[in-house]
């Protein structure tokens, strides 16, 4: 019988783990700058044992989400097609050791015949549903590659990816805009919202992005402000594009992620008259524990 869960989130640049007891309480957490890109081929088992062997007693279950299931990871866990819920993910777990160490698969969907994928975000989404005790929602997960997901009856039915964070890095550090931008400057809310509102006007992102350059040339933006303006342009463009495929206004909208990013999205949505609730709490551990409950309901009991 499994007494506890070792929950692991193994991403591109970081490795995190949590020791969780059978009723869902987190007992201990660990984090290392040892993502899959820092692990040599064939060394995943060794790294896992170095970091978590003391947790892995005979009565433990371990579930690993994130990029560990990619082709460059520990073992590939093929994508589950949407719609997918816990039952679908459970059926497609890749077991390193049967009933002991399992790799969680990501999800795939098609938008206008074009594939889209996620790895790790699906666990955050299910964690949010478990935390909120809801079955239907739409969720935004800001990041390097932001996700907008739809959930109906506890199944992720569809999602879209936006390269917002990556475009911010490219524009603010590797384009002509970098000459007049401090990419790590603190958020200037008023200037950020100017960028958000500018993004809603005709012309499109390729046109509006150059306004960050021209405003700087005419001394309407200084380098510390320019980063907020560019961020507002990009997040505003993302929201404008995503709004067209959102579910009805009555379906609750949640923002998942670190507080700095969720704050920006909350500011932008408020300015655009979209109602959304930001969730600052850690939901990955809740999602992996909920999956463990689905797999072994007699071992991991809902409170």
Across the structure, where does each feature detected by a protein language model lie?
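Glycine-rich phosphate-binding loop plus the immediately following alpha-helix
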Residues: 37, 108-142, 147-202
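Short glycine-rich, Thr/Ser-proximal phosphate-binding strand/loop in the N-terminal lobe
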Residues: 5-43
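Short glycine-aspartate micro-motif
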Residues: 5-9, 61-63, 137-141, 254-255
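Glycine-rich phosphate-binding/hydrolytic loop that grips phosphoryl groups
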Residues: 274-303
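Glycine-rich phosphate-binding loops at beta-strand->alpha-helix junctions
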Residues: 14, 250-268
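Phosphate/pyrophosphate-binding loops at sites that engage ATP/ADP/AMP, CoA/4′-phosphopantetheine
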Residues: 48-61, 239-249
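Adenine-nucleotide phosphate-binding core of ATP-dependent small-molecule kinases
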Residues: 198-239
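Short beta-strand-loop/turn "lid" adjacent to the catalytic site in phosphate-handling enzymes
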Residues: 55-118, 153
